[in-house]
């Protein structure tokens, strides 16, 4: 299967490099608006075609599927163009910051009978998959409380924060998707609170850098997500589910498993610091799954609807923070 990648920033580059490691895929074409970056990556990756105009890549008859990894504001236009060209499409999160655009992306890809796969890579982390299986199999009984800790080692640039849609649509959106995925049910109500504790410039940009979100699922189960834009000790990613028969917990990944014990106690290596280190394997598994879905004709493992639901939860959290009250999901679906 010949694949084209649009957007050669951090994520697009990781995906392009990963495609070179997948037997069932050929990285056939790349596109980026920066000509110098395009030339550099064409030579580095050894791809056949390089297009400055992403529409030329989409219209290339030799391209079977497209990875849209460009800036969020370009996603809807490019995904819809892929649908009209009958190309299966993988789109990085968020699908869009505009719910009407997301609906159109879903509608157009369905009409064209092509896959729309949303890039939520954390579902493909082997530890989180194991935790999901245990919850699904009833190992801990009926789930009562989900707790997700998701803290970045450092905030992104302010220019990025200003266009990101805010912490709930940029950062917590991963956790909203994981909450639905792990629990296997929908959220009906959201309460969010947040503060500016890391960098006052983030507040001036109209966002918070520290947040807690409480979720109420349709079964009555509860979820708690805590986020920070800066954890000085590294990339902090943990999930716990407590249920009627026990609990299951996925801890952080460290650089090594070596632990030194002396008169000062136990000392281990630090947590992985950068998200591309922590989730490198999950990005590869995510792409393998996309390719498998396309070749088999089965529904995407992470659908456009999944992307929409995470976005809705993000908007519910924003509304809750602004209005200082809990928000039912139906209030933002309309």
Curated annotation (Swiss-Prot):
GO biological process, one term: inositol metabolic process
Keyword Translocase assigned: no
EC number(s) on file: 1.1.1.18
Protein name: Myo-inositol 2-dehydrogenase
InterPro entries the UniProt entry points to: Gfo/Idh/MocA-like_OxRdtase_N (IPR000683), GFO_IDH_MocA-like_dom (IPR055170), Myo_inos_IolG (IPR030827), NAD(P)-bd_dom_sf (IPR036291)
Superkingdom classification of source: Bacteria
Family: Belongs to the Gfo/Idh/MocA family.
Pfam family, one: GFO_IDH_MocA
EC top class named in words: oxidoreductase
Key words, A-Z: NAD, Oxidoreductase
GO MF, one example: nucleotide binding
Catalyzed reaction equations: myo-inositol + NAD(+) = scyllo-inosose + NADH + H(+)
Pathways involved: Polyol metabolism; myo-inositol metabolism
Protein purpose: Catalyzes the NAD(+)-dependent oxidation of myo-inositol (MI) to 2-keto-myo-inositol (scyllo-inosose), and thus probably functions in a myo-inositol degradation pathway together with IolM, IolN and IolO. Has no activity with scyllo-inositol and much reduced activity (78-fold lower catalytic efficiency) with 1D-chiro-inositol.
């Amino acid at each position: 299967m010949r694949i084209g990648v649009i957007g050669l920033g951090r994520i697009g580059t990781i995906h392009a490099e990963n495609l070179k490691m997948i037997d069932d895929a050929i990285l056939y074409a790349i596109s980026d608006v920066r000509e110098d970056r395009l030339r550099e990556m064409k030579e580095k990756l050894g791809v056949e075609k390089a297009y400055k105009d992403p529409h030329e890549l989409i219209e290339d008859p030799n391209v079977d599927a497209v990875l849209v990894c460009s800036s969020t504001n370009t996603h809807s236009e490019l995904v819809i163009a892929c649908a009209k060209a009958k190309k299966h499409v993988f789109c990085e999160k968020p699908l869009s910051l505009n719910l009407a655009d997301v609906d159109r992306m879903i509608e157009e890809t369905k009409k064209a009978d092509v896959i729309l796969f949303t890039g939520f890579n954390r579902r493909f982390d082997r530890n989180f998959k194991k935790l999901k299986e245990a919850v699904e199999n009833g190992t801990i009984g009926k789930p009562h409380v989900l707790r997700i800790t998701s803290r970045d080692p450092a905030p992104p640039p302010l220019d990025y924060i200003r266009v990101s849609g805010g912490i709930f649509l940029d950062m917590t959106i991963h956790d909203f998707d994981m909450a639905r995925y792990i629990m296997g049910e929908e959220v009906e109500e959201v309460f969010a609170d947040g503060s500016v504790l890391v960098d006052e410039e983030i507040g001036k940009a109209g966002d918070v850098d520290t947040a807690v979100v409480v979720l109420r699922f349709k079964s009555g189960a509860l979820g708690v997500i805590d986020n920070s834009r800066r954890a000085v000790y590294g990339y902090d990613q943990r999930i716990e589910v407590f249920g009627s028969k026990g609990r299951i917990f996925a801890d952080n990944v460290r650089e090594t498993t070596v632990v030194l014990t002396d008169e000062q106690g136990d000392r281990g290596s630090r947590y992985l610091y950068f998200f591309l280190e922590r989730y490198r394997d999950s990005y590869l598994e995510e792409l393998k799954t996309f390719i498998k879905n396309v070749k088999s004709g089965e529904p995407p493992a992470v659908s456009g609807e999944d992307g929409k639901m995470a976005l809705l939860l993000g908007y519910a959290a924003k509304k809750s923070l602004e209005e200082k009250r809990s928000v039912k999901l139906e209030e933002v679906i309309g």
